Design a protein with these regions (language model features):
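N-terminal active-site segment of His-dependent metallophosphoesterases
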Residues: 26-107
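Extended active-site neighborhood of metal-dependent phosphoesterases/phosphodiesterases
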Residues: 108-203, 209, 277-285, 298, ...
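His/acidic metal-ligating clusters that form di-metal
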Residues: 84-92, 122, 179-181, 191-282, ...
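Sec-dependent signal peptide cleavage junction
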Residues: 15-28
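Beta-strand-turn-beta hairpins that frame and shape the catalytic cleft
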Residues: 26-35, 44-49, 167-182, 213, ...
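Divalent metal-coordination and catalytic microenvironments
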Residues: 39, 93, 98, 113, ...
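Non-catalytic terminal accessory segments
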Residues: 2, 26-29, 318-572
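Active-site environment of divalent metal-dependent phosphoester hydrolases
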Residues: 43-46, 101-104, 132-141, 188-191, ...
């Protein structure tokens, strides 16, 4: 029996040494440094500052929002490339899609950007590599797959080891050590990521395996996120994350891919996933270069460590912009020349503030008019819009009014609900702050919504505006169990008991909850992760699960064969 026990223990130790070998690093090779940008969104400038391409006769299949930096986009690209040119460490540039806002409709926009890339390469000798996004090409549009590849042939395709015959995907050797696999994640309709497109995945896997056989490390670029970057992103934000993200990510991780760069969301975020075998892959969702926050990332890699830093577009050539596009005020020109980050914040804050002021409705949250919840929810969202710009504090503020309804509104630095929501959204997009579920910001928003519900109930003809919180969350895409767990978890933290507060909690989660659970430990803006030469501990799941199974076997043997207990006790 002791021999049997020894065998069991040996198995555990063997698995422990095989799967929990810890972390070791190979000898560092030379550092490689490169820049990554996404969602450049170039647009041909309008004739005047107050105009847009659309009211100047441009007809397109896709319009961007009012916060888009239409007229500034070309000058932002110039400044970005200038920074890369002046950085002696930066060896190449990666662009992860949405290069031109109207790219699938006007080849001229792509050609303008390609000319800038070409000039950069000729002057610096540094290579640019691109992949398409949903704005860049589409079936039955002016710019399709072959057109995109033709325009950008110099930027990855000409030197490619392989180009997928059905998509814009390609693989190319960056140097003697690294291979880039650029994966087209757009389908022919341009908006939806591949629906279980096995041929596309198989092509990528083949490229990775070929690179590995040659002793190369693989990094990847794609437009849509490989992983979910906030809770239930795939359920709530359609067409933002690749299909079957975790099975695909696990496969890539086990093939040795550690770095993936994506975009599309315009959100500065980084997250990771560890496969069943214990291999970790990182998905860096890039900020938008051509919209708020007008930023990109710089990566420095050695075998032992990968460091990354978010870089800002601090200024553009606003004098040249004013020559092309008339009507900018002296104040705006000065701000674009000296503090472009503040200019983009001001512009986006104004746009999103107005959007929140006008657009809080059941439809924008995701509830259709045909829903049984629609009527009650509309009374609440109408009330929120009315309260949007009401001062929270002061003699006639919401805090005072809420007290009359038995609700305590906590103190904060925000002046209005609109300011709280707008600031939270933009801060989240830039990755500058991670909001927790315990944050004062979230508590404040829940309480303000609870007041709106209670006030709406008091003013409604029948006094019935309450909607079922679980039904609401389920209709947004959460499962019944998940909906229950969300409410239980939040209710425990805040001590919510009233039906109004639970309804408010579910609505606050729909508006704000996606900002509140970035707990993966990967820094969004600046940080470091283990390099490709580091083998991270692979015990995570396999060895832990195996050890649990062996312990269970021992427990069963001890239970049904008590005579063997003494052997286990002496041996363990």
């Amino acid at each position: 029996m002791k021999k049997f026990i020894s065998v069991l223990l040996a198995l555990i130790l063997i698995c422990g040494s095989a799967f929990t070998a810890g972390v070791y690093a190979q000898e560092d090779k030379s550092e490689i440094c490169f820049a990554v940008a996404s969602d450049v969104h170039y647009v041909t400038p309008a004739k005047t500052a107050t105009s847009t391409p659309y009211n100047e006769g441009v007809e397109t299949t896709f319009k961007s929002g009012k916060d888009s930096l239409y007229n500034q986009s070309g000058f932002i690209i110039d400044e970005f490339l200038d920074q890369c040119a002046k950085n002696p460490e930066c060896r190449f540039v990666l662009i992860t899609g949405d290069i031109a806002t109207h790219g699938r409709d006007f080849a001229s926009e792509h050609e303008a950007v390609a000319a800038k890339f070409r000039k950069f390469e000729q002057e610096t000798g540094k290579q640019v590599y691109v992949i398409n996004g949903n704005h860049d090409s589409a079936l039955n549009c002016a710019v399709g797959r072959e057109d995109f590849i033709s325009i950008y042939h110099e930027f990855g395709y000409d030197k490619a080891v392989s180009v997928d015959e059905n998509t814009c995907s390609y693989s190319v050797n960056l140097n003697d050590e690294y291979t880039l696999v650029a994966l087209d994640t757009c389908d022919e309709r341009y908006r939806v990521v591949p629906n279980n497109d096995l041929s596309r995945m198989n092509w990528a896997v083949t490229q990775i395996r070929n690179a590995k056989r040659e002793g190369r490390k693989v990094i990847m670029i794609m437009h849509h996120n490989l992983l979910e970057h906030n809770p239930y992103q795939k359920a709530l934000e359609k067409n933002y994350v690749v299909d079957t993200p975790y099975s695909f990510a696990g496969l890539l991780a086990d093939l040795g891919v550690k770095l993936v760069f994506s975009g599309h969301t315009h959100v500065t975020s980084a997250t990771s996933y560890t496969s069943f075998l214990g291999n970790t892959i990182y998905d860096f969702s890039m900020p938008s270069l051509g919209n708020f926050p007008a930023e990109y990332k710089l990566f420095k890699m050695t075998d032992s460590e990968i460091k990354y830093e978010t870089k800002k577009i601090e200024h553009i050539d606003a004098d040249k912009l004013a020559e092309v596009c008339k009507g900018y005020s002296k104040k705006d020109i000065a701000l674009m020349k000296n503090d472009f980050q503040q200019y983009t914040w001001n512009r986006s804050h104004a746009v999103y503030s107005e959007k929140i002021r006008k657009d809080i409705s059941p439809e924008t949250i995701g509830i259709k008019e045909s829903s049984a919840l629609y009527g009650k929810l509309k009374l609440v969202t109408d009330g929120l819009r009315e309260l949007s710009d009401t001062p929270i504090y002061g003699e006639n503020g919401i805090q005072t009014m809420a007290a009359a309804y038995g609700l305590e509104i906590p103190n904060s630095s925000y002046s209005t609900l609109n300011e709280a929501l707008t600031t939270a959204y933009l801060t989240y997009k830039s990755g500058r702050r991670i909001y927790s579920q315990d944050s004062d910001d979230f508590k404040l928003i829940v309480k303000l919504i609870a007041f709106s519900i209670r006030k709406s109930a008091a003013e409604a003809a029948d006094g019935d505006v309450l909607f079922d919180a679980n039904a609401f969350l389920r209709e947004l895409g959460y499962s019944g169990t998940v909906a229950d767990n969300i409410l239980k978890e939040f209710s425990k933290k805040y001590g919510f008991a009233t039906p109004e507060e639970k309804a408010a909690l579910s609505l606050a989660f729909a508006l704000f909850g996606g900002f509140c659970s970035d707990t993966d430990g990967v820094e969004n803006r600046d940080g470091s992760i283990p390099g490709y030469g580091v083998k991270e501990a692979a015990q995570n799941r396999f060895a832990a699960a195996f050890e649990k199974i062996l312990i269970k076997i021992i427990e069963i043997i001890k239970k049904f064969y008590p005579i063997f207990n003494q052997f286990f006790e002496k041996s363990i």
